[in-house]
């Protein structure tokens, strides 16, 4: 399987350099393709060129037998389809057996989001007299104010922020750039952190950096670091909820749409290439439904 692993490394390079995908996305591709490589070993398939449509169907059957969700199976098949598309382009294989496979319909899950009172509990636990507390407050205020992805948050540089018009230049998926606005709360938290806490953290760095969010050693904060920080904040807020960076993104979109923002504008703010990606947020909270009903129905 040496040649197979070498080919995977070529594909990963392509995702990093040409597609500019995040570390998390690339890790998902590696996991999905690695799972298929294990299947190839079990079936004694030595070369990628030898994989047939029958093998793909057998792999699909295995995934279903292991009770994997439709969403998970669809992602794996999509990863492998992209992998073979790359192999075709590089003339490593002569056909894409995954192109013929129909993807299972994804389950449409309503994204988990936070209510205002739950958000408030997260915003009051950080000690604003410390550098770490100032950084954490600025980070969660910004995540909620902008709906940016965790990878985008970690890539923000000081030069990307324009306080005069309260906007940030964001580099999104595929290196696509967009400007996102932020409000008063985020502005105050960012200014406090940049003027005080960030300088304290930056003084510990071996090499200077203009990345906005720094870790305790003065280096750039990573997506994994952000997730760890959020887990700690949620624990201190005594919330019995699972909150990830993406929860803030879901919350941002849900709150905007519930307050009357149009779908196209939210699509632009989130940096979605397709409107269908944004439409998942068109659910509304039960409280909002109740409010609309009470204020609109003649006999409510």
UniProtKB/Swiss-Prot annotation:
MF GO annotations: DNA binding; tyrosine-based site-specific recombinase activity
Gene3D superfamilies, A to Z: 1.10.150.130, Intergrase catalytic core
Tagged with keyword Transcription: no
Residues in Core-binding (CB) domain copies: 2-88
Active site: 149, 173, 246, 249, 272, 281 (o-(3'-phospho-dna)-tyrosine intermediate)
Domain of life of the source: Bacteria
GO cellular component: cytoplasm
Any Gene Ontology biological process: chromosome segregation
Localization, UniProt: Cytoplasm
InterPro entries for this protein: CB (IPR044068), DNA_brk_join_enz (IPR011010), Integrase-like_cat_sf (IPR013762), Integrase_catalytic (IPR002104), Integrase_recombinase_N (IPR010998), Integrase_SAM-like_N (IPR004107), Recomb_XerC (IPR011931), Recomb_XerD (IPR011932)
Residues in Tyr recombinase domain copies: 109-294
PROSITE patterns: CB (PS51900), TYR_RECOMBINASE (PS51898)
Keywords assigned: Cell cycle, Cell division, Chromosome partition, Cytoplasm, DNA integration, DNA recombination, DNA-binding
Family: Belongs to the 'phage' integrase family. XerC subfamily.
Subunit note: Forms a cyclic heterotetrameric complex composed of two molecules of XerC and two molecules of XerD.
Described function: Site-specific tyrosine recombinase, which acts by catalyzing the cutting and rejoining of the recombining DNA molecules. The XerC-XerD complex is essential to convert dimers of the bacterial chromosome into monomers to permit their segregation at cell division. It also contributes to the segregational stability of plasmids.
Protein name: Tyrosine recombinase XerC
Lineage, broadest ranks: Bacteria, Bacillati, Bacillota, Bacilli, Bacillales
Gene: xerC
